[in-house]
C-alpha cells in the first residue's frame, strides 16, 4: 500500500456487534479500502453465546488491529479517526469493540466516530454500488428491514415483527439437522437442501401491511418435518415463502416512495436466489438494482470505517467518554448529515 499522502484522510473502523470482530481501514484516495481483517467466532454447536464471543474478541482484538495497520502499511499515527459500531448488537460483544476504540482514541488523541451497525450495512451497499438514493432491503441474522432516506434519516418502511430472515434460515437448518456448517461453498444449508425440492402445503405466507413475520413459518416448517414431509420440499417452500415476502415489502416501498433504485445488503444479501427475485422485481418497476459487493455483505470493519469516514468528514465525532453501547439502536434514530455523499465525491466545505 502507498504511504499516506498530503490531504489524505484515513479512518480505522471496528466492528464487534455479533460473531465477527472486524477491523477495516479506508482512505479518501484510491485504493479506498486499505485493510480488511476479521476474526470470527464459530460455535461448536447451537447458536451464538455472547459471553464466549466477548472472550474470543478480547483475545483477538489487539492482533486484529495490528494486522490491519500492517496490511494498510500505516501506523496508528497516520490514522485520522477511529470509528466504532456502538449498536445494535449483543452487549458483551459490543463492549469489547467500544473499549478498544475508546482506548485507541484516548491514547493516541484520535477523534472517535460513533457508527450504527445497520446504517453501515446500508452505506456499504451505497458506497460499493454507486446508488445515491436507493430503497434498501437489509437482511441478516439479527435484522430484517426495508429502509430509504427521507428528511435526514433512513426511515423504516417495513420490518420483521419477530425473528430476522437470517435467524429463520439458521434456526431451521440447525433444528432440521443440516447445519452447522450453515454456509458452505457460497450456499446456505437451506439452499443446498432445497435443490430438487418443490412446494408443500402448510407453510404460511405472512405479510402484514409493510411488515413480515417469520416465527410462524419456522414453527410450521418444523411441524411438517415431524409429520414426515420430505426435507427438500420443506426447505424449498420455506425459502420461497420467506424470500418472496421480503421482496414484496421492498416492492411496496419502491411504489410508495417513487424511487428508482434498489439494493440488497446484510449477510443474506449473498444469496443467489434472493438476488434473482430482487432483480426481477426491480426490473418490473423500471428500477436499477445493484446488491452490495458480496465481500462486504457480512459483518466487517470496512463498512464501519467507510461510514465513519463519511461521518467524520461531515463533523460527526464524540468524546471517548460518551461512547456508550446501544444494544437496540434503531436505524431510524440516526441522523445522516452526509447523505447522498459517496466516496470519490469532493470533500464537504
UniProtKB/Swiss-Prot annotation:
Its EC number is 2.3.1.234. PROSITE patterns: GLYCOPROTEASE. It holds the Pfam family TsaD. It catalyses: L-threonylcarbamoyladenylate + adenosine(37) in tRNA = N(6)-L-threonylcarbamoyladenosine(37) in tRNA + AMP + H(+). GO terms for biological process: tRNA threonylcarbamoyladenosine modification. It is an enzyme of class 2 (transferase). Transmembrane segments: none annotated. It is found in: Cytoplasm. One of its GO terms (molecular function) is N(6)-L-threonylcarbamoyladenine synthase activity. SUPFAM superfamilies: Actin-like ATPase domain. One of its GO terms (cellular component) is EKC/KEOPS complex. Substrate binds at residues 138-142, 170, 191, 271. Its cofactor is Fe(2+). Keywords: Acyltransferase, Cytoplasm, Iron, Metal-binding, Transferase, tRNA processing. The keyword Methyltransferase does not apply. The keyword tRNA processing applies. Fe cation binds at residues 117, 121, 138, 299. Binds 1 Fe(2+) ion per subunit. InterPro entries: ATPase_NBD, Gcp-like_dom, KAE1/TsaD, Kae1_archaea_euk, Peptidase_M22_CS. PANTHER family: TRNA N6-ADENOSINE THREONYLCARBAMOYLTRANSFERASE (PTHR11735:SF14). NCBIfam families: arch_KAE1, gcp_kae1. Required for the formation of a threonylcarbamoyl group on adenosine at position 37 (t(6)A37) in tRNAs that read codons beginning with adenine. Is probably involved in the transfer of the threonylcarbamoyl moiety of threonylcarbamoyl-AMP (TC-AMP) to the N6 group of A37. Belongs to the KAE1 / TsaD family. This is tRNA N6-adenosine threonylcarbamoyltransferase. The gene is kae1.
Amino acid at each position: 500500500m502507498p504511504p499516506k499522502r498530503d490531504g489524505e484522510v484515513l479512518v480505522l473502523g471496528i466492528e464487534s456487534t455479533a460473531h465477527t470482530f472486524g477491523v477495516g481501514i479506508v482512505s479518501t484516495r484510491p485504493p479506498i479500502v486499505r485493510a480488511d481483517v476479521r476474526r470470527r467466532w464459530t460455535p461448536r454447536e447451537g447458536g451464538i453465546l455472547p459471553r464466549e464471543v466477548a472472550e474470543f474478541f478480547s483475545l483477538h482484538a489487539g492482533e486484529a488491529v495490528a494486522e490491519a495497520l500492517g496490511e494498510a502499511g500505516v501506523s496508528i499515527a497516520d490514522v485520522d479517526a477511529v470509528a466504532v459500531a456502538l449498536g445494535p448488537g449483543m452487549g458483551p460483544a459490543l463492549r469489547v469493540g467500544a473499549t478498544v476504540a475508546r482506548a485507541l482514541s484516548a491514547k493516541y488523541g484520535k477523534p472517535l466516530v460513533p457508527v450504527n451497525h445497520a446504517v453501515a450495512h446500508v452505506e456499504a451497499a451505497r458506497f460499493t454500488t454507486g446508488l445515491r438514493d436507493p430503497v434498501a432491503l437489509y437482511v441478516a441474522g439479527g435484522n430484517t428491514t426495508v429502509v430509504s432516506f427521507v428528511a435526514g434519516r433512513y426511515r423504516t418502511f417495513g420490518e420483521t415483527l419477530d425473528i430476522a430472515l437470517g435467524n429463520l434460515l439458521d434456526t431451521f437448518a440447525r433444528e432440521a439437522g443440516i447445519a452447522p456448517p450453515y454456509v458452505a461453498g457460497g450456499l446456505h444449508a437451506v439452499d443446498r437442501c432445497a435443490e430438487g425440492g418443490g412446494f408443500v402445503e402448510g407453510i404460511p405466507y405472512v405479510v402484514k401491511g409493510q411488515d413480515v413475520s417469520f416465527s410462524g413459518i419456522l414453527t410450521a416448517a418444523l411441524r411438517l418435518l415431524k409429520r414426515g414431509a420430505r426435507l427438500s420440499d420443506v426447505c424449498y417452500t420455506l425459502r420461497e415463502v420467506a424470500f418472496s415476502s421480503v421482496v414484496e415489502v421492498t416492492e411496496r416501498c419502491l411504489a410508495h416512495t417513487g424511487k428508482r433504485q434498489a439494493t440488497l445488503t446484510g449477510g443474506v444479501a449473498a444469496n443467489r436466489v434472493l438476488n434473482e427475485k430482487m432483480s426481477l422485481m426491480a426490473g418490473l418497476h423500471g428500477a436499477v438494482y445493484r446488491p452490495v459487493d458480496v465481500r462486504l455483505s457480512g459483518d466487517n470493519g470496512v463498512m464501519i470505517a467507510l461510514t465513519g469516514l463519511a461521518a467524520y468528514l461531515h463533523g460527526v465525532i464524540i468524546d471517548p467518554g460518551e461512547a456508550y453501547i446501544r444494544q437496540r439502536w434503531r436505524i431510524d434514530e440516526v441522523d445522516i448529515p452526509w447523505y447522498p455523499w459517496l466516496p470519490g465525491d469532493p470533500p464537504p466545505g
